[in-house]
Amino acid sequence: HKIQQIVNSYKEPPYTSTRYNEIPLQDNMKISGFFQSYKYFNFCRDEILNLFQVCDPMEQKIINNYGMYLDSNVASIHVRRADYLKFSGHYENLGISYYKKAIDLFPETQIIFVFSDDIKWCKKHLPSFGKLNIYVEGQTDVEDLWLMTKMKNNIIANSTFSWWGAYLNKNQNRVVAPTKWFGPKRTADNSLETKDLYPDNWETI
């Protein structure tokens, strides 16, 4: 087969943009960007959900560790700190207040699975909220992501990692997300907009 030369290209606006911009598709086209809106691919969400699978040994490992909770009223909470603290101002520092407001939306019987790159900080601050917290440790990123998709509800950070954990969740779940995504050093005129970032049924605080 003859390899066709790419003759057209499209580059998305800077990655601080969360607006959906319709791509002017043409033949032999290269597209590049972050495309941080579900509207680019929501039409094939069912296909994406079916594609996201883990191998049997990995699934069995996770079920052995946490399966006893998954039929209960469980929610994930993702706390991202390490690199966001390093690049303070570029990303919104959600702080403890965001997580408290989010957790308070759920009943006292809610079991919280905590995912974080700073579990030590979470163990120090989150227990004061009165929920039963299960701190997820010793897993790979793929295992964490897959486990997030098995929750009944998701509380996400301003992070595409937990965004995908919620989006790939097949449950009829409740998703709580932060209103602010980028920090003040991101100067794009639409950097604080999230209308195209989150599906309509997600709650923002």
Give a label for each model feature.
Residues 1, 177, 202-205:
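Non-catalytic N-terminal targeting/anchoring module and adjacent flexible stem/linker
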Residues 1-109:
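Secretory-pathway luminal glycosyltransferase catalytic domains
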Residues 9, 26, 184-205:
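Leloir-type glycosyltransferase catalytic cores
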Residues 16-17, 27, 110, 130, ...:
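A generic alpha-helix propensity feature with a strong bias for hydrophobic helices
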Residues 103-186, 191:
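Donor-binding and catalytic core of enzymes assembling or modifying cell-surface/extracellular glycoconjugates
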